[in-house]
């Protein structure tokens, strides 16, 4: 007797760098455990590898995570987190010196709620990866990928 197949919702998003449609599922308990374990280590390499593994597990179809620009990975992870845990997060700013308090630390921290579904990538229409040095010579640049983080 075969094990039952879990039915999980599948979502789509568009990669900012290529406008390619990517299908993904929310992360499950096993992916959340990978992330929590990595965050406890406080080692950037372990956290980066955990994010890559979670994306590989949750993205459907062929997509090479190692070749994606870092902003695509961050965007995908935000979308994944929004569908898995919840769209809204609360970000707290620590007390900081402010002019209204004669340069002393403000007494209260500031909390801001962010809806991850509303996070958008703004692309300049004139953006190009080509940089012309002269009329005849140019350089084609590439976006940094996740390997630069290790």
Task: Please identify what each model-predicted range represents.
Residues 1-150:
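Long C-terminal interaction/binding lobes of large macromolecular proteins
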């Amino acid at each position: 007797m075969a094990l039952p197949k879990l039915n999980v919702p599948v979502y789509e998003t568009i990669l900012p760098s290529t406008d390619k449609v990517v299908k993904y599922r929310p992360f499950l308990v096993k992916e959340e455990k990978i992330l929590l374990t990595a965050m406890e280590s406080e080692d950037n390499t372990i956290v980066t590898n955990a994010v890559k593994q979670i994306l590989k597990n949750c993205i459907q179809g062929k997509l090479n995570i190692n070749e994606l620009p870092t902003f695509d990975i961050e965007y995908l992870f935000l979308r994944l987190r929004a569908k898995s845990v919840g769209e809204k997060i609360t970000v707290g700013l620590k007390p900081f010196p402010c002019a209204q308090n004669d340069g002393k630390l403000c007494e209260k921290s500031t909390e801001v709620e962010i809806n991850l579904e509303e996070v958008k990538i703004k692309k300049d229409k004139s953006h190009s990866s080509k940089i012309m040095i002269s009329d005849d010579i140019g350089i084609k640049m590439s976006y940094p990928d996740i390997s630069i983080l290790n």
